[in-house]
Amino acid sequence: MEPLNNQILDCLKQRDPFAVATIMTHKGSTPRTSGSKMIVLKDRTIYGTIGGGLVEALVMDACMKLIDKHQSRIKEFSLDKELKDGLDMVCGGNLTILMEVFVPDPGLTGIFKALVSLEKEGKKGFLVSKIDGFSKSDFSTRKCLVLPDTTITGQPLIPKPLMDEICDNLFTGTFPVLYNHGLEEYIIEPIHPSDTL
């Protein structure tokens, strides 16, 4: 299986906008867990899965619309009785899914080149996305890669207090978290060498 970030880098090199759907949180019985990802291309090609079924189809449809608008969204899905009826689903939990649109540009491609190199070297880091707008509505993001030694690839989007928190290993999970720092919102994703589709 090709590592996820290698696949994202390949998609960035194609220069067409695409989306990455990531399960940020899950509660109860769900087909996949937090951190599961799926790349969605404009032609509806997918790489990876967030669990299949109706939720995956709904996420794909939402991603298509978001790609056209160059906007991202965080949305909750409930695998309740209404959604499950007639679908032979046994899950009954809730998912919060980040549907993030990637619009290729040299800076973003450079960040993912550095990230892929980091993973090949077996090192850790943090992919930080600053939300432009508010997470309760559609938004866009700007990214940078942060290493534990405070080296940054990309724009320096992070205020020093947040940089200190990141580098003090306060974010040790395996999936992205939405983090409020004052009035600004960030998505902080710990990077581990084993991230795959």
Language-model features, listed with the residues they occupy:
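Segments forming oxygen-rich coordination pockets for charged ligands
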Residues: 1-197
